[in-house]
């Protein structure tokens, strides 16, 4: 599992971005990849999965 912070999440559109703590890489997150409801600034744990446009955050949960 990786740790990061929610940079942005648009609930009405169902997507956002997470910044990984250790590398500062930014990853796309879709509502379908959430375990918990997230908001901007939340500290989260997540896994990565290859998507159509690169790596996506999945199994995202607030820590």
What is each stretch, according to the model?
Residues 1-8:
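Structural detector for short beta-strands of small beta-barrel domains
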Residues 3, 26-28, 43:
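Well-ordered beta-strand positions in beta-sheet-rich domains
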Residues 10, 22, 50-52:
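A generic beta-sheet turn/junction motif
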Residues 13-18:
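Short aromatic-glycine-enriched beta-strand elements
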Residues 24-36:
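Beta-strand/loop nucleic-acid-binding surfaces
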Residues 34-45:
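Short nucleic-acid-contacting surface segments enriched for D/E, G, S/T with interspersed K/R
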Residues 49-63:
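OB-fold/S1-family single-stranded nucleic acid-binding modules
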